[in-house]
């Protein structure tokens, strides 16, 4: 019998991330490298660890192998616990056959037995594909104080981007009065961050109700939350004012990496009070050659720099040979950049080999970002 837990987190990490093109051809979106040494999922798992959430179910589906290997037993995030800790929850076969996760609500519904063993009071539902730092314990306190059935973390987005998100319309007390999924003409710019806290009894009841509805797409935003509102349940919006980035496109992933290089970034990776943990690559120290030049860049272990690197993010094991320039770019693990290469405003995928004399930069629109990755 598992030990009772006040709050259990369920981390949705099965997304394909098709807008990231070749970067997710053989890799789940939460496993995509970010920030020179991390994977995207590191931020959510580190938030759980730093918030005192010690029981985390990770729901995987698309290209799960590398993600499973990376997570392991959760020791990198201090989540390798005897009671609770990290549990990877892929779809599984029953007597009726394999049940794939058909939506966010479907994924949680199929793992109600996992949740039930902990008899939680609250369930925290998270997405594994956003970049942010957040104390979930403060959101839980807010949820309890407001006596909510469900609390939804929201952030103000630019009005011209609001139609890309699930939008909350609230009253003065921040109680949600209407939820619109990607509205054409939004009446609010409070966007859902895909972070929910449910009272366990409410979650179980409404997921079972949703599963019985043959017309449902089994999605929290499209189906479950509107149903809760229709039935008069209390949904509270929890305002978040820190850094938050949906890195669902090549350009947004590049932008988030570039944000780390600002003199005053709101995403501080050097915050000793809120560390972002990752799996140690166990590479040797970086080597910067005598004639090399490095400015405003993040250079991870195992890199050999003989050329020039400016305002860029280089992951472990990257080689930049003599005469080459890397500017405003992200170079992922193990990439080899030959001699006299120019790379500007680009993402270079893992293990890519860039031949001598190659020039990579946007051809038409200078604001574009070039992706060079296997399968592109």
Swiss-Prot record:
Nucleotidyltransferase listed as a keyword: yes
UniProt record similarity statement: Belongs to the bacterial/plant glucose-1-phosphate adenylyltransferase family.
Name recorded for this polypeptide: Glucose-1-phosphate adenylyltransferase
Coiled coil feature spans: none
Function as written in the Swiss-Prot or TrEMBL entry: Involved in the biosynthesis of ADP-glucose, a building block required for the elongation reactions to produce glycogen. Catalyzes the reaction between ATP and alpha-D-glucose 1-phosphate (G1P) to produce pyrophosphate and ADP-Glc.
HAMAP family: GlgC
Assembly with partners or alone: Homotetramer.
Catalyzed reaction equations: alpha-D-glucose 1-phosphate + ATP + H(+) = ADP-alpha-D-glucose + diphosphate
Protein's gene: glgC
Keywords from the UniProt entry: ATP-binding, Carbohydrate metabolism, Glycogen biosynthesis, Glycogen metabolism, Nucleotide-binding, Nucleotidyltransferase, Transferase
InterPro entries: ADP-Glc_PPase, ADP_Glu_pyroP_CS, GlgC_bac, GlmU/GlgC-like_hexapep, NTP_transferase_dom, Nucleotide-diphossugar_trans, Trimer_LpxA-like_sf
Pathway terms, separated by semicolons: Glycan biosynthesis; glycogen biosynthesis
Keyword Nuclease included in the entry's annotation: no
This enzyme's EC code(s): 2.7.7.27
Organism, scientific name: Bacillus mycoides (strain KBAB4)
PROSITE patterns in alphabetical order: ADP_GLC_PYROPHOSPH_1, ADP_GLC_PYROPHOSPH_2
């Amino acid at each position: 019998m598992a030990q009772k837990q006040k709050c259990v987190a369920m981390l949705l990490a099965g997304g394909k991330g098709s807008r990231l093109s070749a970067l997710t051809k053989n890799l789940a979106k939460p496993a995509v490298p970010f920030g020179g040494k991390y994977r995207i999922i590191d931020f959510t798992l580190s938030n759980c660890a730093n918030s005192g959430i010690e029981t985390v179910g990770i729901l995987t589906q698309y290209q799960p192998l590398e993600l499973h290997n990376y997570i392991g037993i959760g020791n990198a995030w201090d989540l390798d616990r005897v009671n609770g800790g990290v549990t990877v929850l892929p779809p599984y076969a029953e007597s009726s056959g394999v049940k794939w996760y058909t939506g966010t609500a479907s994924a949680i519904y199929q793992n109600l037995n996992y949740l039930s063993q902990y008899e939680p009071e609250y369930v925290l539902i998270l997405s594994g594909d956003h970049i942010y730092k957040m104390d979930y314990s403060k959101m839980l306190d807010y949820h309890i104080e407001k006596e909510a059935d469900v609390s939804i973390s929201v952030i103000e987005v630019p009005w011209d981007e609001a139609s890309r998100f699930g939008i909350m319309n609230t009253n003065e007390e921040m109680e949600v009065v209407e939820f619109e999924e990607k509205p054409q003409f939004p009446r609010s710019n409070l966007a859902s961050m895909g972070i929910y806290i449910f009272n366990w009894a409410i979650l179980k009841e409404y997921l079972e109700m949703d599963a019985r509805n043959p017309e449902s797409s089994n999605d929290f935003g499209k189906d479950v939350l509107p149903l809760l509102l229709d039935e008069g349940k209390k949904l509270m919006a929890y305002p978040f004012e820190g850094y938050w980035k949906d890195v669902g496109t090549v350009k947004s992933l590049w932008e988030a990496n570039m944000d780390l290089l600002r003199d005053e970034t709101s995403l501080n990776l050097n915050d000793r009070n809120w560390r972002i943990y990752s799996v140690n690559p166990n590479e040797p120290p970086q080597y910067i050659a005598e004639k090399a030049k490095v400015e405003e860049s993040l250079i991870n272990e195992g890199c050999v720099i003989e050329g020039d690197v400016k305002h860029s993010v280089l992951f472990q094991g990257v080689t930049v040979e003599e005469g080459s320039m890397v500017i405003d770019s992200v170079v992922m693990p193990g990439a080899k950049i030959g001699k006299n290469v120019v790379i500007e405003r680009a993402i270079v995928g893992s293990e890519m080999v860039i031949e001598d004399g190659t020039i990579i930069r946007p051809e038409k629109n200078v604001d574009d970002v070039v992706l060079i990755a296997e399968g592109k």
